[in-house]
From Swiss-Prot:
Identification of the protein by name: Mitofusin-1
Location, primary (coarse class): mitochondrion
Any one GO molecular function term: GTP binding
Stretch list, region Part of a helix bundle domain, formed by helices from N-terminal and C-terminal regions: 9-73, 338-364, 703-734
Lineage: Eukaryota, Metazoa, Chordata, Craniata, Vertebrata
GO-annotated cellular components: membrane; mitochondrial inner membrane; mitochondrial outer membrane; mitochondrion; outer mitochondrial membrane protein complex
Domain-level remarks: A helix bundle is formed by helices from the N-terminal and the C-terminal part of the protein. The GTPase domain cannot be expressed by itself, without the helix bundle. Rearrangement of the helix bundle and/or of the coiled coil domains may bring membranes from adjacent mitochondria into close contact, and thereby play a role in mitochondrial fusion.
A Pfam family this chain is assigned to: Fzo_mitofusin
Organism: Rattus norvegicus
UniProt topological domain (Mitochondrial intermembrane) ranges: 606-608
Assembly: Homodimer, also in the absence of bound GTP. Forms higher oligomers in the presence of a transition state GTP analog. Forms homomultimers and heteromultimers with MFN2. Oligomerization is essential for mitochondrion fusion. Component of a high molecular weight multiprotein complex. Interacts with VAT1. Interacts with THG1L; THG1L probably functions as a guanyl-nucleotide exchange factor/GEF, activating MFN1.
Amino acid sequence: MAETVSPLKHFVLAKKAITAIFGQLLEFVTEGSHFVEATYRNPELDRIATEDDLVEIQGYRNKLAVIGEVLSRRHMKVAFFGRTSSGKSSVINAMLWDKVLPSGIGHTTNCFLSVEGTDGDKAYLMTEGSDEKKSVKTVNQLAHALHMDKDLKAGCLVHVFWPKAKCALLRDDLVLVDSPGTDVTTELDIWIDKFCLDADVFVLVANSESTLMNTEKHFFHKVNERLSKPNIFILNNRWDASASEPEYMEDVRRQHMERCLHFLVEELKVVSPLEARNRIFFVSAKEVLNSRMNKAQGMPEGGGALAEGFQARLQEFQNFEQTFEECISQSAVKTKFEQHTIRAKQILDTVKNILDSVNVAAAEKRVYSMEEREDQIDRLDFIRNQMNLLTMDVKKKIKEVTEEVANKVSCAMTDEICRLSVLVDEFCSEFHPTPSVLKVYKSELNKHIEDGMGRNLADRCTSEVNASILQSQQEIIENLKPLLPAGIQNKLHTLIPCKKFDLSYDLNCHKLCSDFQEDIVFRFSLGWSSLVHRFLGSTNAQRVLLGLSEPIFQVPRSLASTPTAPSNPAAPDNAAQEELMITLITGLASLTSRTSMGIIVVGGVIWKTVGWKLISVTLSMYGALYLYERLTWTTRAKERAFKQQFVNYATEKLQMIVKFTSANCSHQVQQEMATTFARLCQQVDVTQKHLEEEIARLSKEIDQLEKIQNNSKLLRNKAVQLERELENFSKQFLHPSSGES
């Protein structure tokens, strides 16, 4: 015949299921705690997860770890109480099918004993407050050990660990607690607090040879005050004694039943009358123990002298065990796991709320960040497009301003060159025709002209140029302002100060007129050289004066040649006439210079022609004029001649650099405006860089927020799955009847 499954397995399965669920729950909350902590401590994600959320979920993680340890140690607990020598230890031994606890004459229990299974093959005991495992081989040795220990008092607990292989009942997480008699102590409250609050079932072992005593009732009244409707069984032990008086058996049984029912229903009010009848049993623990030990040894159950009605008492004991196992398994599952299940659901609800709040905050932040990123991208595109347009406009503006400056400087410099004589006349310094003095004089004159012209040009151009540059810079700044942040706009004038711009004209007169050669030697106005210069000009006069050493009347070959072909009869042109005149005068001058005789001959001819008086008057006037000019050729006159020569020379040289100087000034203006624009562009570049960095930061933040949303949803789905498992656990183990319906 196959053995039926013990109802105690219900608790074992429930414990295994709830332990697994709490293990998953702890793993889930730990994962959620790490997720919330990482989110909270991320400096880039502000206000997504709060410190309160982190503290709360970490607290749940710690609580679940403790609950997991408690669940692993949870077991069904039944406590046996009764008066001294009522047979409590015998009942436990009968249930264990072996003499585990000392019982019988002279072996009363003097302290609390808890019997639980061990996976080892050796029995041992541990006293309260000690971790020492004391080996126990026989029941007598256990009894001897308990009675020899003088430190054991009625309120002490001794753990007896019995091999599970020797006792099937201990394999299903069941702990049986034996107690001293309730009539040996007044410390009932301490007992209850210490040993009864976590008990799932209480068994009152009464002596059927007497009635329920007040000490027994008093104890359970106190238990009922501390616990809400405790599960209480009443065993009327030693019922085999009734076999000696069979005529009174039913009356005695009815009397005990009525008193026990009244105690459970009316006094304690823990069960209904119908349920109470299933909590009261009439047994003989000693008979059952002997019978089961015989059976374990292969002997007949009924061997030995047994009182009449043994089979009925054995069956009732078995009914008690069946009812007890069903009751304790259901009760233990409910008392040990129901509150933890409710607490787990509450934790899941709270964690789900935290995850939902994180998810919502991340979603809102993500939408805001995406909108902000789009705004930043649009602004970056706008700045880039505007910069392209503004760059072309600024280049055009710079070109217009530089051309305007070049024209102004060119006109002003031309006017100043025309007024150069006035500037030279204003120069006063010591003048002397010696080379050393002349060198100093020329150097100072060059400096005077350079300073004067520079000053005059600055007076005429600088203010207008500055106004034009300032206006252009202001226009550029105003056009670029909208592209910069408000904070930079307010500081723009400090970053790009509009300072006064001074043009550098750099005339460099010293080098420009370095090859000037003055001519301040006295020259008579009616002298031969002066006349030649006056009539022929400087270039032709030079040719004539240098040609004195050539042969007399040397004429160009073109005039001496005989034409072989017809020529035009027209008069010679001006160039030919000029060439002929030069040739004749050169020949004449050469003749007069070659011999003084020629002078005498010419003078004689003139003397004969006009007379000596006219010649004398002419020579006198000629000499007087020469003398006048010679006397008036002073240092002052030399200085005037020097200045006039310098003005003519400098005018020619300065006119050559008008275009260069105006171009130089326009280049300076171009550099100034380009530098200003470049500084502004630097600020715009910084702004663009900040925008690019902000866009990159927002993109990273959006990715992180999306990941947070996904993780929070994933964790929430895990929470929902755990809720389903808890619900299934409740239907299967806590409320099986409702689950079936």
